[in-house]
UniProtKB/Swiss-Prot annotation:
Gene3D superfamilies: MFS general substrate transporter like domains
Lineage: Bacteria, Pseudomonadati, Pseudomonadota, Gammaproteobacteria, Enterobacterales
Location in the cell: Cell inner membrane
Pfam families: MFS_1
A single MF term (Gene Ontology): transmembrane transporter activity
Broad class of where this protein is predominantly found: membrane
Keyword ATP-binding assigned: no
Residues passing through the membrane, by range: 14-34, 52-72, 90-110, 113-133, 149-169, 171-191, 219-239, 254-274, 288-308, 318-338, 376-396
Protein name per UniProt: Multidrug resistance protein MdtG
Species this protein is from: Proteus mirabilis (strain HI4320)
Disulfide bonds: none
């Protein structure tokens, strides 16, 4: 099975799938500013019920993505990563059109779940690039790739809000579908992969996949680290606007300030991710991961002690710059410990744990805030990251299998 494209076509693939990740990130985030309004339009009027059903509609996509990811990862190792990119982009485009026609909350939930099942563009993009990029440039390549979805997620809510104001809620779903279809077309014509399909009987079992890992204990730790990164990122989401209101008092532009402070980590990530990736290629991604996990703890604790919102914004910018190094470092370390034949499944397992973190992070933050106050969320999150730091440090000290 030959996975390496000729010459430097991996660079072309990197730039094309970066654009695909950008379109996917933008497409997903286009609808986020008005999802509660769409739930309300579907008949959920009570305030408490609206909060509940909006949360369910948001989380169900990640839940079903986590369930489906291992299946698609196994299929990508048999049929190729480009096919999975095409399947994901086209499938999500079709579902977005159907969401635009939803008539009640149950139809929306089913379609949001289907969106999670058919998703997976980003992990398959990671697997494609990971199996093609020279090892010495893997940190930079995966760091650069990570900025694609971040860029799309940053610009998506702004464009989505403008489109919803201009054209209404439902047309935005059709526009999102068009964006995802463009992603499908770009991938179809411009991504190259030299892949020899593997028959079902020759495909490795799950036990064989894990047995083939160079350092199974470390890879499992990296899966867990991915989940904790998303838990730490998402734990603040439910309380951020309310915490800013507590810090700022009665201000007229709360929504604008909250939006800016919510966005600054992504802006910092765009700047720092490729640079940390190059640093990881030079000194080792394990050192970068341990260093940034430790730094993030020292960013989280002061957030509980700030006295005004601009201090919170500055700390979130620094945290975003630090966090940008973590997932690419994890992915690079995973790449070091796998063979190309199992890349799809291993990256899909990692994505599944990432989705679990996306679901549990906001739930944890909301629970801690409800019982102990907003500031306790930052202390609790720092404690979780500290536990992960110790676990990672111990795992890195475990000898690699010969």
């Amino acid at each position: 099975m030959n996975l390496k494209p000729r010459n430097n076509s991996w660079k072309q693939n990197l730039y094309i799938v970066w654009f695909g990740c950008f379109l996917t990130g933008a497409g997903f985030s286009l609808i986020m500013p008005f999802l509660p309004l769409y739930v309300e339009e579907l008949g959920i009027k009570d305030h408490e019920s609206l909060n509940l059903w909006t949360g369910v509609a948001f989380s169900i996509t990640f839940l079903f993505s986590a369930i489906a990811a291992p299946f698609w990862g196994k299929l990508s190792d048999r049929k190729g990563r480009k096919l999975m990119l095409l399947r994901s982009a086209l499938g999500m485009a079709i579902v977005m059109v159907l969401i635009g026609f939803a008539q009640n909350i149950w139809q929306l939930l089913i379609l949001r779940a289907l969106l999670g099942v058919l998703g997976g563009f980003v992990p398959n993009a990671n697997a494609l690039i990971a199996t093609q990029v020279p090892v010495k440039k893997s940190g930079w390549a995966l760091g650069t790739l990570s900025t694609g979805a971040v860029s799309g997620a940053l610009i998506g809510p702004l464009i989505g809000g403008i489109l919803a104001d201009l054209y209404g809620l439902r047309p935005v779903f059709f526009i999102t579908a068009a964006v995802l279809f463009i992603c499908f077309i770009v991938t179809l014509f411009f991504v190259s992969e030299n892949f020899t399909p593997v028959s079902k009987k020759d495909a490795l079992s799950t036990q064989q996949v894990f047995s083939s890992l160079k350092n199974k204990r470390l890879v499992i730790c990296l899966f867990f680290t991915t989940m904790i990164i998303q838990v730490a990122t998402g734990s603040v989401t439910p309380i951020l606007t309310l915490y800013i209101r507590d810090l700022a008092g009665s201000i007229s532009n709360l929504a604008f300030i909250s939006g800016v402070i919510a966005s600054v980590p992504g802006i910092a990530a765009l700047i720092s991710a490729p640079r940390f990736g190059k640093l990881g290629d030079r000194i080792g991604p394990d050192k970068v991961l341990i260093f940034t996990l430790g730094l993030s703890i020292f960013m989280l604790i002061p957030m509980a002690l700030v006295s005004n919102y601009w201090e919170l914004g500055a700390l979130r910018f620094l945290l975003g710059a630090v966090n940008a190094a973590m997932l690419p470092a994890v992915q690079t370390l995973i790449l070091y410990n796998i063979t190309p034949a199992i890349a799809g499944r291993i990256f899909s397992y990692n994505q599944a744990l990432r989705d679990v973190g996306n679901v549990t992070g906001p739930l944890m933050g909301a629970f801690v805030a409800a019982n102990y106050g907003f500031r306790a969320v930052f202390y609790f999150t720092a404690a979780v990251v500290f536990f992960n730091l110790i676990y990672s440090w111990i795992s890195f000290r475990t000898p690699q299998r010969k």
